[in-house]
Design a protein with these regions (language model features):
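N-terminal glycine-rich FAD/FM-binding segment characteristic of electron-transfer flavoproteins
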Residues: 1-263
Length: 263
């Protein structure tokens, strides 16, 4: 079984974010991590490797620095890493990104493709389903548990989150899953895994290596959506706790609202 896992290097947004004048994220000002949903998807692939002897190839699109998440993935147990990087691919929205990744994946053999549900730097949840559409594959989104993989009959059974419930979905292989962070707890890298990861060669592809993709669907020029404006959310100050009897508390709160001209 050949499993492809799409991962993305994203800024760690827990400490807040900074923006460039053009509205894009200032990634140089933040630590870079593997997107959490993608990491859960990687762990799912590695568990299938442990169980079925699958070969796991991790693919990322980004700047040369994105090689770091491929090394991390291989240190966790992935077999191969592919970096798709080219200046002409920069500024891509979800449409152009999915076209790029699909063009890269056409070079590889696969029985299953796993992506994260969404990236924390965009939160669109669009790229995974778009890749499946470009490749003509069935997609199961919001995967929270893989119940069964049948290699002989080529199908997979997955629990798909649906509000506070879940669907049990069966799909023929090859197919694409988008994984929730709750799918599982990713394993840690091991010293031996780190050593092996840095001993391996990363495959690097550019525009010329993408199959069946028109230039009009790539990069900033091929992106039908662009950022009009972006800003950090206003962070609220600490709240105030009122510990008076009910009548006095009500009077106090009304007074505070009046001070701020809310009432």
């Amino acid at each position: 079984m050949n499993i492809l896992v799409c991962v993305k290097q994203v800024p760690d947004t827990k400490g807040g974010v900074k923006f460039n004048p053009d509205g894009t994220l200032d990634r140089s000002a933040m630590l870079a991590i593997m997107n959490p949903d993608d990491k859960a998807g990687l762990e799912a692939a590695l568990r299938l490797k442990d169980q079925y002897g699958a070969e796991v190839t991790v693919v990322t699109m980004g700047l040369p620095k994105a090689e770091e998440v491929l090394r991390e993935a291989m240190a966790m147990g992935a077999d191969n890493g592919v970096l798709v990087t080219d200046r002409v691919l920069g500024g891509a929205d979800t449409w152009a990104t999915s076209q790029t990744i699909a063009g890269a994946l056409r070079n590889l053999d696969y029985d299953l493709i796993i992506t994260g549900r969404q990236a924390i730097d965009g939160d669109t949840a669009q790229v995974g389903p778009q890749i499946s559409e470009h490749l003509g594959l069935p997609v199961i989104s919001y995967a929270q548990k893989i119940r069964e993989v049948n290699e002989a009959e080529k199908y997979i059974v997955v629990e798909r989150q649906y509000d506070d419930r879940y669907h049990v979905v069966k799909a023929q292989l090859p197919c694409l899953l988008t994984a929730l962070a709750e799918l599982n707890e990713p394993r840690y890298m091991t010293p031996g895994g780190i050593f092996d990861a840095y001993a391996k060669e990363i495959t690097v592809w550019g525009r010329k290596d993408l199959k069946e993709v028109e230039d009009s669907n790539l990069g900033l020029k091929g992106s039908p959506t662009q950022i009009a404006k972006a800003s950090d959310k206003v962070r609220k100050g600490a709240g105030e706790k009122v510990e008076l009897d009910p009548a006095a508390s009500a009077d106090y709160i009304v007074g505070k609202l009046a001070e701020k001209h809310i009432i």
